[in-house]
Amino acid sequence: MEAWYKVATPRKEVRQGRSFNPDEFAIHLEQVIAGTAPEDYREPEKFFSRTCFTRALREHAGMVLRRLSGETVNTAPVMTLITQFGGGKTHTLAALYHLATNGEKAAEYSGVAELLAEAGIKTVPAARVAAFVGNAWDPQDGRETPWIDVARQLAGNEGVRELGDMAKTTAPGTEALTRVFKAADRPVLLLFDEVLNFLNRHRSMADQFHAFIQNLTVATTGTTQGTAVISLPRSQVEMTDWDMQWQ
């Protein structure tokens, strides 16, 4: 039997005896999108070269790609990722982000060709992606509410106009959200992470945010090329009593 180091080459950090920074093991979706995450998470080629396509990741990514391709069988308009702390929720969202924003080019990345074959589609559809990361999000000029932020990411100023005049205080209805999807003029992928963290920090917005998510679910169901993926914790360590009631 060959020595293990001849069969599996250790990563460069191990070979060099470099001390590990625990922060490097935590992925933050907002940093991936902003381009400030560590290179292994920020660069899609490196990200996929070091990603293990588990059954859960293959299933979720396959369903999302099929939906963005216009398929309605073996897929879903809204998906929830519910795992224990450290179970890979944000890693899955980052994988979906890299796939959707790179489109056809993503087929060149490690493991993606096999993913496409398993999903029964030929290419990765390029999509408009909007991400909401609850532990990073706070109101700012131009994104006074989560739905304004999402609309702006999908369709710029036109998307915000489609929400109507009440968007700064009131969650949009399904018709307004459908107009935003049409203004995006591409398949639409919506990623939600750390939602409960946001609600804990902005409890005055909880009712309106809940209405937004409900209406978004209905609007997404009404399109054949749009999907929303929402991560939620399973572990009580990550939730307060109020979180569990809201969830």
For each predicted feature, which ranges?
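Conserved phosphate-binding/catalytic loops and adjacent sensor/switch elements of nucleotide-binding enzymes
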Residues: 92, 136-151
